[in-house]
A protein has these predicted regions:
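Protein kinase catalytic-loop region centered on the HRD/HxD motif
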Residues: 63-73
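A short, aromatic-enriched beta-strand patch in the conserved N-lobe beta-sheet
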Residues: 15-16
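Conserved catalytic-loop aspartate of Hanks-type protein kinases
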Residues: 136
Length: 166
């Protein structure tokens, strides 16, 4: 899916090749790390992002998702670790390993594979319902919450507690 995307807020696909049965993908390098690490670095002193900083992070992410949705694709693993940053402050959506093309109707499910990162999965995914655009929006809301609060919206001592909290 990444090869079909060309947007300033999506990591660029440079090259794909098969090397002895292994798929190698070369992508643009985001030299500023990822959003998860930026959040972790702010946690000790609770150095919250200012409102304009949140906007500069969240708006490009929304534009990237709008672009891939416009191409009838879904990311399916939206999380702060997959929001990459450049040293100049650009936000880039990366890691399209779980992304899938969807049918003409957004109401239809997208793939039958259970995938994603537990903290960002919507309640219906935990009930093993198929992935849909609603699930993608749930994860987007989780990312926004994490940027604003410097912590994930849901947690737990173990997976069962996390699922109950979601």
């Amino acid at each position: 899916c990444l090869a079909r995307c060309s947007h300033p807020n999506i990591v660029k696909h440079v090259l794909s090749m098969d090397l002895d049965g292994m798929l190698l993908i070369v992508m643009e390098y985001a030299d500023g790390g990822d959003l998860y690490k930026q959040i972790k670095a702010r946690q000790p002193g609770m150095k919250y992002f200012k409102e304009h900083e949140i906007l500069f992070i969240f708006l490009p992410l929304c534009l990237a998702l709008d672009h891939i949705h416009g191409k009838r694709m879904m990311h399916r693993d939206l999380k702060t670790a997959n929001v990459l940053l450049t040293c100049t402050g650009l936000v880039k959506l990366g890691d399209f390993g779980f992304s899938r093309q969807y049918e003409d109707s957004l109401s239809k499910p997208v793939g039958s594979t259970f995938c994603g990162t537990p903290y960002y999965l919507s309640p219906e995914l935990w009930r093993r319902a198929p992935y849909s655009k609603k699930s993608e929006m749930w994860a987007l809301g989780g990312v926004l919450y994490e940027v604003m609060a410097l912590k994930r919206p849901f947690g737990g001592k173990n997976m069962d507690e996390l699922i109950d909290n979601i």
